[in-house]
Amino acid sequence: MSLGNHIRVFLCVVFMGVLVGYVYNAKKDITDHDYIDIVKEGYLENFSDVTVRNAFNYAFFEPYWRYYQAKTKEQVVELSGDITFQGEKGHAILQFVVDEQTKQFSLRAMKFNEVVLNAEQKQKLVGMVYHTWEMKQLAYE
């Protein structure tokens, strides 16, 4: 094997190592972040008796949490999962925005089956999630 081939093989190995490292670290950063913990352990306004994590884990099938920084530089925690809403089974996506200074968060956007929900629909979905949690708590008593 010539020196040129050795260099090409070496560069390919280095490139693959960098690529694997990037993919591994990017996945870890997205699903394991302090802002995700802030939202999971926090409470939504008007629902101070149960954490966001507990309420949504009861209502969502296989909830998936991830973090990213939006193009607007906002810190976004996104929760997605399957849920039945208004008699229809589907996939919901909720986006919480975390304030970097105060570490407070708010629910900003929500989709159900790729349709953006308006304020009234968001309230209904969140209310249904917390109602589901309450009903399951009563069932365990």
Residue ranges of predicted features:
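Cystatin/cathelin-like cysteine-protease inhibitor module
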Residues: L3-R8, L19-E141
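Sec-dependent N-terminal signal peptides
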Residues: R8-V14
